Design a protein with these regions (language model features):
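Alpha-helical substrate-recognition element adjacent to the catalytic core
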Residues: 2-153
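A recognition module on extended beta-rich or small alphabeta surfaces enriched in W/G with H and D/E
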Residues: 152-161
Length: 161
């Protein structure tokens, strides 16, 4: 008998009201509409210019790196990305539902007998560090998001991990 109930969550617009990048845009005074308009044009641009098909859900990561390297996101590194986790606007009841679902089964005698438990996982095209910096992490088993590699010398985001 399997004893783990795995709950898999998306992050943006599922757990939070908006996008995890919103506080970054605000801090760096970058217009989110303009940023996403630029990003949404990239798949067509690369298809026409280089005959390359890019993933429209993740091409924004390259744009974030370009902005960091050009100074628009000056000093943006993994530590800063993690700190933005504290500024995410969770929907009402989140993160309490993470704790509640785990505790609920601990108090059930049948679940105790069979060691049935709930585990929470987050799958996102967002920044792993941004999620890692949230208050959810005490109740999340794992995250599948994007890791960014920092430039060794300049300590800003530089590559997709």
């Amino acid at each position: 008998m399997k004893n783990i109930i795995a709950i898999i969550w998306d992050f943006d617009k599922t757990l939070i009201d908006g996008y995890m990048q919103d506080p970054i845009f605000k801090d760096y005074n970058v217009n989110p509409h303009e940023f996403w308009t630029e990003v949404n044009a990239l798949p067509k641009k690369y298809k026409e210019e280089q005959h390359v098909k890019v993933n429209p859900d993740t091409i924004y990561l390259n744009q974030f790196i370009r902005y960091a390297q050009s100074g628009k996101f000056e000093g943006l590194n993994n530590a800063k990305l993690k700190s933005y986790g504290e500024r995410q606007n969770f929907y009402a009841g989140i993160p309490a539902i993470f704790k509640h679902t785990k505790e609920m089964l601990k108090n059930d005698p049948v679940c105790e007998e069979y060691n049935i438990k709930v585990e929470h996982y987050i799958v996102s095209t967002g920044f792993d560090e941004g999620i890692r910096g949230t208050e959810l992490m005490n109740d999340v088993e794992n995250i599948w998001g994007w890791e960014l590699i920092e430039h060794e010398e300049h300590k800003i985001i530089n590559e997709i991990g």
